[in-house]
């Protein structure tokens, strides 16, 4: 079953086609990567899915429901969360407070409850804090809840951003270059973490990533974009051997060196 399905999605900026007739299907509880050179349209596609951009043509479906043109908050309410290439934490808030921000769509206490601070509001706040600390433990950040996010190491800030995305209880999680700026050890930890999101929480993952080691190591299916067009789609093994992909993105040397990487990462 497809969690996400796009049909001939086209997005233009002036006279430039940032996306042209993109068909993409993301299967339930899969890890699906989107790769391509800078400017290929990867983040533009994410922005169309999440409602930040409205495509000029085509449709996007989430669990069979047409979400084309819905506002970002409506898409979030329907169970889509996202992280960004550049970390967007609230630097002067604690780790727990950052996660509470991500829970906002699901909190029932409104403005009046917040002002009166009645019993129901207090109970909901207590439950929310407990859930935030549970998410921190799941993300390997136990004991860090009361630290300012700006004081966490870079890799932990990445995981905190993921924890905040999980606070929305998503069934589709969009990750935009989750290993950007990480050292090899942090990258390996993030790869295992992404697998856990799928295996333990049943979350479907749509991933943008430039590190081919990561893409080949965790993806079940890979879609390749170039100049806003889909030029290939297939398994890691198929993508490595695709001449158009090699020419447009990987380069002959990169492609020839990926087989051993894929094997070692798949068994890690």
Regions found by a protein language model. Give the residues of each.
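Glycine-rich phosphate-binding loops of nucleotide-dependent enzymes
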Residues: 1-268
């Amino acid at each position: 079953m497809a969690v996400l399905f796009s049909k001939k999605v086209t997005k233009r900026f002036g006279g430039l086609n940032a996306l042209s007739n993109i068909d993409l299907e993301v299967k339930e509880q899969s890890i699906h990567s989107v790769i391509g050179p800078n400017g290929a349209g990867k983040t533009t596609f994410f922005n169309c899915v999440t409602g930040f951009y409205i495509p000029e043509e085509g449709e996007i479906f989430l669990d069979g429901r047409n979400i084309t043109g819905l506002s970002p908050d409506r898409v979030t309410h329907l169970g889509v969360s996202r992280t960004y290439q550049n970390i967007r934490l609230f630097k002067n808030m604690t780790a727990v407070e950052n996660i509470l921000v991500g829970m906002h769509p699901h909190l029932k206490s409104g403005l009046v409850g917040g002002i009166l601070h009645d019993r129901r509001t207090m109970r909901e706040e207590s439950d929310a804090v407990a859930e935030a600390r549970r998410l921190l433990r799941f993300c390997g950040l136990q004991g860090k809840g009361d630290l300012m996010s700006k004081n966490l190491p870079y890799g932990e800030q990445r995981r905190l951003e993921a924890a905040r995305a999980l606070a929305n209880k998503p069934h589709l999680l969009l990750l935009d270059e989750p290993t950007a700026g990480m050292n090899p050890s942090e990258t390996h930890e993030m790869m295992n973490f992404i697998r856990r999101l799928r295996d333990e929480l049943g979350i479907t993952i749509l991933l943008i990533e430039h590190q081919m080691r990561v893409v080949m190591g965790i993806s079940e299916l890979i879609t390749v974009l170039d100049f806003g067009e889909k030029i290939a789609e297939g398994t890691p093994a198929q993508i490595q051997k695709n001449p158009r992909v090699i020419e447009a993105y990987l380069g002959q040397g990169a492609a020839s060196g990926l087989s051993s990487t894929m094997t070692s990462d798949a068994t890690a």
